Amino acid sequence: MRKSILSFLEKKGKNEKITMVSAYDYHSAKILDNCDIDIILVGDSLAMTVLGMQDTLSVTMDEMLIFTKAVSRGAKKSFVLADMPFMSYQSSDRDAILNASRFIKESHANGVKVEGGIEIASKIKLISQSGIPVVAHLGLTPQAVNMLGGYRVQGKDLQSAQKIIDDAKAVQDAGACMLVLECVPVKLAQKISSILEIPTIGIGSGKYCDGQVLVYHDLLGLNKDFKAKFVKHFDKIDPQVGVEKYRDEVKSGIFPSEEHSFDYLDDELLDKLY
């Protein structure tokens, strides 16, 4: 049976960790599906990981649709989540709904992911009201890398931390069914996870999120040119073994450890957040 948004909400309620991996092809999707990974994210990170681009901004809808189709063919039980690429939803309500629906109709995805907070809440509402599950993404949002001044931790001071909390509440109220938190301090991610009713999925945001996500190529150590602080290599010899190790360490709370997380907020500042 296909995993569902309802099953992820139940996991949060039972304090059971959700496993997510970003992958881009039929073969890796089959491995992840066989390893009982909850969610396969067809991330726009494929622009850099697979297509060799400098950032995620240049990947197109047509390219994302092709890779999502491949993953959908390989995943029989895992929930397939498609990243909506840069400017496929920001420009207008019409674009947001039409492009989201293309992922469902043409690529057989089960939901879509968008980056941003209050500023895209209206689009999250429109897409979710059309019957398409929407996952939001806050913190380090790669599509806004030029605005953020590079790939760096977000929410390190009172003002920016409160902004992320406000955005998290806004996307939940708009109908988002889940929230990815990328590169935010551990204690901030913990606070957001406790405030929200929807599950949080962390990447570089500590062990207190309701689940974790890593890129398939990263957790297997296939990218020799780059290793972020939040990445752990599990096994590059046998992909199935590597994915199973990742799954088990997420579920048991071993991963991520302090080594793979960021913590810039002291308790005095944390007490001022609401």
UniProtKB/Swiss-Prot annotation:
Cofactor(s) annotated in UniProt: Mg(2+)
Alphabetized SUPFAM superfamilies for the sequence: Phosphoenolpyruvate/pyruvate domain
Protein name: 3-methyl-2-oxobutanoate hydroxymethyltransferase
Assembly mode: Homodecamer; pentamer of dimers.
Localization in the cell: Cytoplasm
Lineage of origin: Bacteria, Pseudomonadati, Campylobacterota, Epsilonproteobacteria, Campylobacterales
Pathway this chain belongs to: Cofactor biosynthesis; (R)-pantothenate biosynthesis; (R)-pantoate from 3-methyl-2-oxobutanoate: step 1/2
Cofactor comment text: Binds 1 Mg(2+) ion per subunit.
EC number: 2.1.2.11
InterPro entries cross-referenced by the UniProt entry: Pantoate_hydroxy_MeTrfase, Pyrv/PenolPyrv_kinase-like_dom, Pyrv_kinase-like_dom_sf
Pfam family, any one: Pantoate_transf
